[in-house]
């Protein structure tokens, strides 16, 4: 599995700011969007372009456009919504596919409860967004669903990943690509990433 830890200074700086224990909801949301945008830049670097001719201000001009790439952004509810706008800044016409999965706090197992996928998902590149890759359960369940519906090209964008989550994802889906702003130390006994960001969903939605 291709794993890319984005080491750009802006990404590292912004993730550092997100680790502050008393960060405001407003600031956390802003940073989640900004880092999501920067991760998108990295994740789409291999998109092919083609030459097309358009009508410019002074007549026809040849420009580069992304070649035949249909994209769907797949936020995992609810925390993934906090990264979605950062992705859409670059691809405002991308279709949105929503997957609802929560993690049982006792068993740490993923529990699916909702999905609404874009049409022609089998023809699209899926950019799956979720702030945290902890145990990997929710991400694996989401990718299972996408593949069941015929999606063959999947890239995962997360703010922070744990080694345990990366290992589980690679074992289940070695053909996906993972882009993360940080690979942290480990999971604690409650399945939270250490040092991590805390509960990203609570911080994004102001329910902490």
UniProtKB/Swiss-Prot annotation:
Originating gene = upp
Give binding positions for 5-phospho-alpha-D-ribose 1-diphosphate.
78, 103, 130-138, 199
> Could you tell me which species this protein originates from?
Vibrio parahaemolyticus serotype O3:K6 (strain RIMD 2210633)
Which residues participate in uracil binding? 193, 198-200
GO terms of biological process kind:
UMP salvage; uracil salvage
Chain's role: Catalyzes the conversion of uracil and 5-phospho-alpha-D-ribose 1-diphosphate (PRPP) to UMP and diphosphate.
Its UniProt pathway annotation is: Pyrimidine metabolism; UMP biosynthesis via salvage pathway; UMP from uracil: step 1/1
Task: Specify the domain of life of the species encoding this protein.
Answer: Bacteria
Name of protein: Uracil phosphoribosyltransferase
- Tell me its family: Belongs to the UPRTase family.
Instruction: Quote the CDD domains the UniProt record gives.
Output: PRTases_typeI
Which Pfam families does its entry note?
UPRTase
Protein keywords:
Allosteric enzyme, Glycosyltransferase, GTP-binding, Magnesium, Nucleotide-binding, Transferase
> Which Gene3D superfamilies does the entry mention?
3.40.50.2020
């Amino acid at each position: 599995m291709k794993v890319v830890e984005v080491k750009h200074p802006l990404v590292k700086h912004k993730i550092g700011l997100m680790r502050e224990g008393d960060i405001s909801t407003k600031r956390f949301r802003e940073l989640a969007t900004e880092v999501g945008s920067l991760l998108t830049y990295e994740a789409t670097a291999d998109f092919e372009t083609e030459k097309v001719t358009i009508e410019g201000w002074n007549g026809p001009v040849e420009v580069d456009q992304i070649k035949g790439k249909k994209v769907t952004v797949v936020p995992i509810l609810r925390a993934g919504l906090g990264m979605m706008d950062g992705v859409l800044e670059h691809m405002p016409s991308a279709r949105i596919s929503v997957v609802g999965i929560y993690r049982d706090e006792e068993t740490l197992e993923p529990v699916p409860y909702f999905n609404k996928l874009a049409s022609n998902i089998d023809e699209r590149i899926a950019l799956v967004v979720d702030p945290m890759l902890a145990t990997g359960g929710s991400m694996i369940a989401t990718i299972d669903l996408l593949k069941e519906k015929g999606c063959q090209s999947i890239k995962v964008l997360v703010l922070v990943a744990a080694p345990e989550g990366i290992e589980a994802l690679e074992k289940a889906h070695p053909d996906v690509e993972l882009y993360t702003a940080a690979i942290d130390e480990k999971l604690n006994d409650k399945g939270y990433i250490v040092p991590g960001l805390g509960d990203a969903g609570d911080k994004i939605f102001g329910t902490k």
